[in-house]
């Protein structure tokens, strides 16, 4: 068996990636979220495939096909809710995974980090298009509002929006192409995940101390495979409780009303995992400025390795940077809350303040604090 594992062309790759992989001996539970993201992606692809067997991407039947899945298909309701809440679990793990990368300085592995940013954008695009498919009120108006942002691009904006829509408004052509892209993107994400892992295994994993762990490695299996299994149990338990006891907790009641272009919902908002970016978009009164801020709220991650001024890689021994990191986390939670509130005072001013603080923290405060810590340590 050992010989097959180490000599067979395919088994050899799996062995070097998941069994005999040398891993740092001190990585904490924050490193569990990578494997949990792999599990989430698998769950989403499997449940999505079964949903696609019964879903019809036509404006006249999309809403009723989702109702048909829930009422008439064997266990259709649970497949639908695992898929919907699985997306929430996916983003929850994704945000923690990125946060861990920021805290422990994993962004210094440039190739891995940049592929990770591409993965984030691809997953966000997939989730957005998936939200449009049930063709409820929030699906229709969310698609209209977000795609309409492209019209802010000078010269080509209007033509670009109509090209994305496939007409002069969000309609049948839009729904059909969104379904096609929503189906293919998870497989592109899976391919990017493989590239992400290839780059990670080129350099080896980071660890909480941020220093080289070449002198102290242990095999991935059984140590970290068992450790990851604990995370899997927690994730599946949380997802099961959410699906079986409160499946609509994170959804919007407006999406149980069929899409109607003549009636605008009182408050258009995306799913909770986009609310921080939506709050940044709304905080700027100018349309083009808002779109640029929205794009930068994600793309700013690509600048972080170049803004890293500290002599130490990890924040483990940098208390001032730790404080700033948790200020950033609190700020993102504030933005998420604001994104779900109506556009009125005091929410407008809170959103604007939090948006300024978000960019200020990443672009100015964190690099300056790192330089100050270098001075304190006489480096």
From Swiss-Prot:
Highest classification ranks of the organism: Eukaryota, Metazoa, Chordata, Craniata, Vertebrata
Cofactor: how bound: Binds 2 heme b groups non-covalently.
Organism: Nycticebus coucang (Slow loris)
Residues binding heme b b562: 83, 182
GO molecular function: metal ion binding; ubiquinol-cytochrome-c reductase activity
Sites where the protein binds heme b b566: 97, 196
Gene Ontology cellular-component terms listed: mitochondrial inner membrane; respiratory chain complex III
Job of this protein: Component of the ubiquinol-cytochrome c reductase complex (complex III or cytochrome b-c1 complex) that is part of the mitochondrial respiratory chain. The b-c1 complex mediates electron transfer from ubiquinol to cytochrome c. Contributes to the generation of a proton gradient across the mitochondrial membrane that is then used for ATP synthesis.
Protein name (database record): Cytochrome b
Domain of life: Eukaryota
Main subcellular location of this protein, as a coarse class: mitochondrion
Similarity remark: Belongs to the cytochrome b family.
Record's subcellular location: Mitochondrion inner membrane
